[in-house]
């Protein structure tokens, strides 16, 4: 009888835990909902949330706008969601709202882009400095002789992109490369502007050895990006094209000859892990403060594997 009673208690406890998890709502906040990169984080979030029995709410600014991101985060705090994962557009701007969430006993983590000076409890995403280094290493592999380069970033206050720039500079400047005047340019995650800036770099510096962004924004304006590459390769067939990320449009660009190498992140993995980490935090469990998602190097030799 005692064993039966204990078994019944255990079953009730398990059912109670499952019911509690089913009621939990976790917010995933991207820098901008117009960025296809974050669609994969959303998909990973939704799939994992269904698997573990929680709800993933995906909402962010329509486009890259740090002030709007802060307001959306504030709204989630007011609504009393059970946890928040945010890809931080401006590391300084979120410090206050993250503290408010923590004061309200709402777990907060960052994904993709960190704010390590805030009260966030964990980060899940790329080692961005290493990604910058890898971009540089791939360029040097294609063009061993030191030359000149221009680079492009998204928002100047994005910690992840600044880390990526630092890694790129470490790799290239350490190997004797020189950055051209006007670099880096900042596109604020705007694909059309990003493609135009690449063209502008080439127009102003027709002898530049390479133009190597730290984000793949330009490839999401395919026609404009293809026009840029076609213009360059009419005169410079040997210009190496090393691009970040490996979303389907970028993989197809590589397959079609509009890139030589892609250094890809794993945004779906970030979205999924964000749900797992928030659930653990909500249950009072310990989590690792830094959770690194890996990188993938894609070339013409293995692109078909990634396109499947």
Name every feature range the model reports, one short phrase each.
Residues 3-5, 13, 20-308:
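A residue-level marker of the well-folded mature domains of exported/periplasmic proteins
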